[in-house]
């Protein structure tokens, strides 16, 4: 059974949807709104309920009532025609009676049919008469289509005109019976108006689509002409290229040229022959000028959804066009351009076939085929080695060369690359002077005199612990001085000082002469190729002998210019400032002869002089700028770390923003403290600096892991033997990185047989809680050099029983660690004979054992001594005494020529005349 919606039932019986919904709900039907559906029998019940709810009147009464209404209307009409005055007679209102809806619907339908027929004839006449001009035809069409227009005023005008015409001829047809006054909705009229509006809208859209199709056809024709012209031009160019390459033995190029010349026109023609389904289905040739179809399939355009779906339908699913858009003419196929092969090809190891094809502008399939002919099986995503790439390029006739890749993480390339500096921008720079010499020969005193400060008095034990970089000005020119330690432990720091210096001042005490560190400084300077200026210090002291110093230095290859050598000698007294001016003039003279120059326009490069950790500032590094200019906020890579220059201070502690060549500065902003002697370089941006720093740190870690010794069959015995060696674990914390290195190197050089030093951890900064935790876990001793533990670290060390040793002089640390190493060894014992006794008689006691009566013949016998039982010159037993008595008393010892009794633990086989030898094991102190 079919179903009906409530709004359709309301439309049929002339009721509102709300009334129908309420009536259906009162009948017990499960409906919610006017869109709810009911069965056909339920729909009949609803209609009958409306009919039965009102009192039915007889048919004749209805007819009589209709007759009265018609008659009254006729009378009123006649009165209106004959007399314009309003009637004074009161009109009686008809009593409300039951309505016959079926009769009313039939009457309305009949009236509408007659009206449509009459208006249709009138429309035909108007259309025939108004085809002479466009404007008049438009007006006639507007009048003829009045019944389709949703303009109720126009319908009323047509109705009034028809009424007047029929009134003149006295042939007015019977009108439908007058209905009682009320605002009823004329659904038929509204449906007719909606149909008219839809038809008009479709007509407008049809005309617009027709015009668009015509424009698209004209555009397609124009594009076809352009495509033909382009194809002819491409054929001519291909023919020229073919003639140009005819002399070259490249078969594949000929095939490609022929394909390119023959392909475009055929492809374009075949594609143009295709017609879309929408063009086939819509034949606009059958439409008239107004865009309305005269024949073919007439679809029911009254359904609004059908109209919308027809407008927005997409019949050709193969075309990726948007809905509602007509498919234009297909685009002509552009022909493939022919590209010349490059003359040179720069490749990198591991390039894929697809990358090579893109670079030389060839198809990957072509390269795969060539490789197959060469005996190499490859796909377009497969990597090729350098030899294969070169063979492939030879086959194409291209010169191939490998690309030189620059390692961005390599800082050393800036120092080795001569092209890094611009020769036109080289200017004179201040010399970098390093002061070297033996301990207490006056290096820091000389530097102190030069700077007019009292730094030297603050050195612990008279030893400079780390490099100091200072800059002074003499005769309008600047000189940079580096002060290096003289102790033997600081060999690496002296070597670093020689590597970054331009001139070496070798200071030798006139009363002390050449010492081991003096010779070492000479060797460092010669290895670096640095000129040496000898300053003979302490000439004011009694016993000073400069001539002896000159002769001793000549034995080591440092010859004075007075003796025909190359080294300048100046006799000074650093304490009293004697001949200091002459020494500075000599430095400037040697610097002028060396022609020291630098390029201040490049990005800065240089060397780390010293590095430390500051509690408030973090990592602080003392840098010596060798080339370029260092600015604040420059991204920088220092050793295996990176950062941005947050702040710069000079040797006087003042903030500076720019540091030129040969300028020492201290910077902050690094993520961790670098190693002294590391090189640094400024990068273009922070991203590049970060990448280079992280890569260098990764390489350093990998190198450290590679240096780890692994156990193998060859070194298995050595490893087991090394496990027997005892070790002293130490944790080193110092104020500067150079002191950390020197202290660690010195401790590792301590030679105590059977014991070695194991540096568990070494760093710059104060002793903190993590150091104490590490020392507890590794059973290590913490050595603090010029640093103090934090209060929290000290409390934790006391609680965990961790030993912290604090020092300020390096040789004190070495002595203390050496003592600890000696105490770590197992003690050595030496046997000491106390005395001898002879067994005179034996006594066997049950449940006790054998008691030997003895007499001491030499030395003494003690209670805690060990004894040997010797019989006939052979040791029978070696053990401990269980008891020792003199007569009946227990005694600790029995002296010479005395008698006593003894028992030996776990031994009862004593016999007369056995010799008892008493001895102890005495510890020997290591030297």
Swiss-Prot record:
Keyword Cytoplasm attached: yes
Composition-biased stretches (Basic and acidic residues): 70-86, 101-138, 160-171, 202-226, 234-257
Originating organism: Streptococcus agalactiae serotype III (strain NEM316)
Protein's name in the database: Translation initiation factor IF-2
Protein family (similarity comment): Belongs to the TRAFAC class translation factor GTPase superfamily. Classic translation factor GTPase family. IF-2 subfamily.
A Pfam match: EF-G_D2
Gene3D superfamilies: 1.10.10.2480, P-loop containing nucleotide triphosphate hydrolases (3.40.50.300), Translation factors (2.40.30.10), Translation initiation factor IF- 2, domain 3 (3.40.50.10050)
Positions of the UniProt region annotated as G1: 437-444
Region (G4): 537-540
């Amino acid at each position: 059974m079919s179903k009906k919606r409530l709004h359709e039932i309301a439309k049929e019986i002339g009721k509102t949807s709300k009334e129908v919904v309420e009536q259906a709900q009162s009948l017990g039907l499960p409906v919610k709104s006017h869109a709810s559906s009911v069965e056909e029998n339920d729909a009949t019940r609803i209609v009958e309920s409306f009919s039965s709810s009102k009192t039915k009147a007889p048919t004749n009464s209805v007819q009589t009532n209709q007759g009265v209404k018609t008659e009254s209307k006729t009378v009123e009409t006649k009165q209106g025609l004959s007399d314009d005055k309003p009637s004074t007679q009161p009109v009686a209102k008809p009593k409300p009676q039951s309505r016959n809806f079926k009769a009313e619907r039939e009457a309305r339908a009949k009236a509408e049919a007659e009206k449509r027929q009459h208006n249709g004839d009138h429309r035909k006449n108007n259309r025939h008469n108004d085809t002479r001009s466009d404007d008049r035809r438009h007006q006639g069409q507007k009048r003829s289509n009045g019944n389709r227009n949703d303009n109720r005023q126009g319908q009323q005008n047509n109705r009034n005109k028809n009424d007047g015409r029929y009134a003149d001829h006295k042939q007015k047809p019977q009108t439908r019976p007058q209905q009682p006054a009320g605002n009823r909705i004329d659904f038929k009229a509204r449906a007719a108006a909606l149909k008219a509006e839809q038809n008009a809208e479709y007509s407008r859209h049809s005309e617009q689509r027709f015009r668009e199709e015509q424009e698209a056809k004209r555009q397609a024709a124009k594009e076809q002409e352009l495509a033909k012209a382009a194809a002819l031009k491409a054929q001519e160019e291909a023919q020229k290229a073919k003639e140009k390459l005819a002399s070259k033995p490249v078969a594949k190029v000929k095939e490609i040229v022929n394909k390119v010349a023959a392909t475009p026109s055929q492809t374009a023609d075949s594609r143009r022959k295709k017609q879309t389904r929408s063009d086939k289905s819509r034949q606009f040739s059958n439409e008239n000028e107004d865009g309305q179809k005269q024949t073919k399939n007439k679809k029911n355009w009254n359904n609004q959804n059908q109209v919308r779906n027809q407008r927005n339908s997409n019949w050709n699913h193969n075309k990726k066009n948007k809905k509602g858009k007509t498919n234009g003419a297909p685009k002509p196929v552009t022909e493939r351009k022919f590209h010349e092969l490059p003359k040179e090809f720069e490749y990198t190891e591991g390039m894929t076939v697809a990358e090579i094809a893109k670079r030389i502008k060839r198809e990957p399939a072509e390269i795969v085929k060539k490789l197959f002919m060469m005996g190499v099986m490859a796909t377009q995503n497969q990597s090729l080695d350098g030899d294969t790439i070169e063979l492939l390029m030879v086959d194409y006739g291209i010169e191939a060369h490998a690309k030189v890749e620059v390692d961005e993480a390599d800082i050393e390339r800036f120092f080795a690359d001569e092209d890094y500096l611009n020769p036109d921008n080289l200017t004179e720079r201040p010399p970098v002077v390093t002061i070297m010499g033996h301990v207490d020969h006056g290096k820091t005193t000389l530097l102190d005199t030069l700077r007019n400060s009292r730094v030297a008095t603050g050195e612990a034990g008279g030893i400079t612990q780390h490099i100091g970089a200072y800059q002074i000005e003499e005769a309008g020119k600047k000189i940079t001085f580096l002060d290096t330690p003289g102790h033997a432990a600081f060999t690496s720091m002296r070597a670093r000082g020689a590597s970054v210096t331009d001139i070496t001042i070798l200071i030798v005490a006139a009363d002390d002469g050449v010492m081991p560190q003096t010779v070492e400084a000479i060797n460092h300077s010669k290895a670096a190729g640095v000129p040496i200026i000898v300053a003979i210090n302490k000439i004011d002291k009694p016993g000073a002998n400069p001539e002896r110093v000159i002769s001793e230095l000549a034995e080591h290859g440092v010859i004075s210019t007075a003796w025909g050598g190359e080294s300048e000698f100046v006799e000074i007294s650093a304490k009293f400032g004697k001949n200091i001016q002459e020494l500075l003039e000599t430095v400037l003279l040697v610097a002028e002869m060396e022609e020291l120059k630098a390029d201040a326009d490049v990005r800065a490069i240089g060397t780390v002089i010293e590095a430390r950790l500051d509690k408030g500032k973090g990592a602080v590094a003392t840098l010596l700028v060798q080339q370029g200019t260092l600015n604040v906020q420059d991204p920088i890579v220092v050793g295996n770390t990176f950062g941005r220059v947050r702040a710069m201070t000079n040797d006087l502690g003042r903030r500076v923003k720019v540091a030129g060549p040969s300028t020492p500065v201290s910077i902050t902003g690094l993520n961790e403290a670098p190693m002294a002697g590391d090189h640094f370089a400024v990068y273009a941006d922070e991203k590049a600096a970060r990448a280079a720093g992280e890569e260098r740190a990764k390489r350093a870690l990998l190198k450290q892991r590679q240096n780890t010794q692994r156990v193998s069959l060859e070194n298995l015995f050595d490893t087991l033997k090394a496990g027997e060696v005892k070790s002293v674990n130490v944790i080193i914390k110092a104020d500067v990185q150079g002191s950390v290195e020197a202290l660690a190197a010195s401790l590792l050089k301590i030679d105590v047989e059977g014991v070695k030093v194991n540096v568990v951890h070494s760093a710059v900064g104060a002793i903190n809680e993590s150091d104490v935790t590490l020392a507890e876990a590794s059973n290590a001793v913490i050595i603090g050099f010029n640093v103090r533990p934090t209060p929290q670290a000290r409390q934790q060390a006391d609680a965990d029983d961790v030993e912290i040793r604090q020092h300020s002089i390096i040789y004190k640390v070495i002595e203390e660690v050496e003592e600890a190493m000696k105490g770590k060894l197992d003690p050595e014992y030496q046997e000491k004979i106390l005395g001898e006794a002879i067994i005179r008689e034996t006594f066997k006691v049950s449940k006790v054992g054998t008691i030997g009566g003895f007499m001491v013949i030499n030395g003494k016998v003690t209670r805690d001594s060990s004894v040997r039982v010797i019989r006939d010159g052979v040791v029978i037993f070696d053990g401990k005494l269980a008891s020792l008595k003199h007569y009946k008393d227990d005694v600790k010892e029995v002296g010479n020529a005395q008698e006593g009794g003894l028992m030996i633990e776990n031994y009862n086989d004593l016999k007369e005349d056995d010799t008892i030898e008493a001895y102890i094991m005495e510890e020997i102190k290591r030297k």
